[in-house]
Every structure is written in structure tokens, then in C-alpha cells.
UniProtKB/Swiss-Prot annotation:
Lineage of producing organism: Eukaryota, Metazoa, Ecdysozoa, Arthropoda, Hexapoda
N-terminal signal peptide: 1-22
Annotated glycan sites: 192
Active site: 98, 214, 269
Protein name in UniProt: Lysosomal thioesterase PPT2 homolog
Gene: Ppt2
Length: 288
């Protein structure tokens, strides 16, 4: 009887260890005007309910430094993901929140040989941003309709926001001056266009999370690559060139069953990574 009990305990211990080892490491990138500490609730939930998970809570470009040029940030995030990936050849999961999701996506695209298995974009402006509520968090005296005068300039492009400010009624200026979003979305062809697409289609899973009550990402459908047209009507991503022309591989991922779109109502932008029920419903299913 004593031997059987010892064997049972050993089996349960081995089972627990194997489950822990099964969870892939998770890299988390914070949003704008915040830092790694803002993602602490999410880290605690992962560590409590997925014990043994290695979590890398990236602390680069905290606070006002998060307003630095987007490519400068992407370069460091790319190197960070590359180093973490080398430590875990079995593959990693990357979760980027808000601006962090956009920077993380660009970093992944810049690593065509990455080993990111799942990328979770948590309420991130993947198709750009155009809205007063977001703008006034950072530039209180700037109006959305005239923000292009700042952002579509050499000075404006030194800010991260300028890199993904997408004025639907100033598309000529957006394509002419913006040095970030049109490139990673392959709206402007460059020598990196092919590798940017390769970085995306290399993913096993792309999870896009957002919702209609976000109140910061504008339009909220940008979290799923949807966006305004020149008449300010929101066009869903499946009707936009980024999907129909498969410019960065989103259509390829969808056809392979690797694209997951999550729409969650009644969640404010600041709650996606802090509300326990939201974390468990929209994030945990994709942490394997």
C-alpha cells in the first residue's frame, strides 16, 4: 500500500512537471506612456494559473521613452525577441498590448527566421490610429483633424505616434511622410517587403483582440486591421487591400486556419490586461 502511494505521488508529480514544461515562454510588451509594471496583473495571472511558465515582461522604453521613434523601438524589441528566442528553441509566445502590439508585430516581421509560435495583439492599432480620445492622452492640445500637420513632418516622425497616425482624409500625406506603418503594412514597397511578409506567415497563430467599447483605439476595428475610408466609414479588414492582396500574409494565415479574431464588448482599453475575467477569457486560451 505504501509503495502504491509513493508511485501515485511520483506519477502526479511527473504529470504536474510535464504540464508546466508544456507551457511556452511568454514575452509581454507594454503600451504607450507606461512600463513593465503596468503589465504586472497579467504576469501574476499567468504565473498563478500556468505555473512554470517563463514570463519575460519587457521593460524597454518606459514612460515618455515610449514616444521615441517607432523604428528605434522596434530595433531594440527585435533584438530582445531574437535573444529570448535563442534561449527557447521550442518556440515562444509574444503578447503586445496597445502600441506594444504594433511594435511587437513590426519586430516579428523584421525577423523572418524567428521562432515566435503565437503572436497575440491585444487592442493594438494595427491599421493605424485616428481619434481624439487617444490623441489627448498624449497631446492634450492637438486636434485630430489638424494633427497631420505635426505628424506628417520630419519632427512628427520622430514620435512613435507619428509613425502610425493614419489620417483617412490625408492618405497622400500619410503615404508620403509616414516612415513606419505604410512600410510594415507593405502599403509602400521596399526591399524589406518580402521579408516582412515572411515574418508574418511564419507564425503558427495570429490572435487579434479588440472590442467596440475600447474608447481609445480608433476605430476600434484597427485592432483587427479594419479602418476608416475617406468618408469615415469603417471598412472591415477582409475588404481592405491588406487582406485582399495578402500584402503581409494575413489572408495566407486565415486560409491556413491560423488567424483568430476576438471581439469582446464592454472592455475599456485599460482593462484588457488588468481585469481577471477578461484575461482568462481572451488571452489564456492562446497560451499553450
Amino acid at each position: 500500500m505504501r509503495l502504491r502511494l509513493q508511485v501515485l505521488v511520483a506519477l502526479l508529480t511527473c504529470s504536474s512537471i510535464s504540464v508546466s514544461l508544456a507551457y511556452k515562454p511568454v514575452v509581454i510588451l507594454h503600451g504607450i506612456l507606461s512600463g513593465a509594471e503596468s503589465m504586472a496583473s497579467l504576469v501574476r495571472e499567468i504565473e498563478e494559473f500556468h505555473p512554470g511558465t517563463i514570463v519575460y515582461n519587457c521593460d524597454k522604453f518606459n514612460g515618455w521613452y515610449s514616444l521615441e521613434n517607432a523604428w528605434r523601438q522596434v530595433d531594440q524589441v527585435r533584438d530582445y525577441l531574437n535573444e529570448v528566442g535563442k534561449l527557447h528553441p521550442e518556440g515562444i509566445i509574444v503578447l503586445g498590448y496597445s502600441q506594444g502590439g504594433l511594435l511587437a508585430r513590426a519586430a516579428i516581421q523584421s525577423l523572418p527566421e524567428h521562432n515566435v509560435k503565437t503572436f497575440i495583439s491585444l487592442s493594438s492599432p494595427q491599421a493605424g490610429q485616428y481619434g481624439t480620445s487617444f490623441l489627448h492622452l498624449i497631446f492634450p492640445d492637438l486636434a485630430a483633424k489638424t494633427a497631420f500637420e505635426l505628424f506628417y513632418s520630419r519632427v512628427g516622425q520622430h514620435t512613435s505616434v507619428g509613425g502610425y497616425w493614419n489620417d483617412p482624409q490625408r492618405q497622400d500625406l500619410y503615404l508620403k511622410y509616414s516612415e513606419f506603418l505604410p512600410l510594415i503594412n507593405n502599403e509602400k514597397k521596399t526591399s524589406n517587403s518580402t521579408s516582412f511578409k515572411m515574418g508574418m506567415v511564419r507564425l503558427n497563430k495570429l490572435v487579434m483582440i479588440g472590442g467596440p467599447n475600447d474608447d481609445v483605439i480608433t476605430p476600434w476595428q484597427s485592432s483587427h486591421f479594419g479602418y476608416f475610408d475617406e468618408n469615415m466609414d469603417v471598412i472591415p479588414f477582409i475588404r481592405r487591400p491588406i487582406f485582399t492582396s495578402d500584402s503581409i500574409g494575413i489572408r495566407t494565415l486565415q486560409e491556413a486556419g491560423k488567424l483568430i479574431i476576438v471581439v469582446k464588448p464592454h472592455v475599456h482599453h485599460l482593462a484588457w490586461h488588468t481585469r481577471r475575467d477578461v484575461i482568462h477569457e481572451v488571452i489564456f486560451p492562446y497560451l499553450d
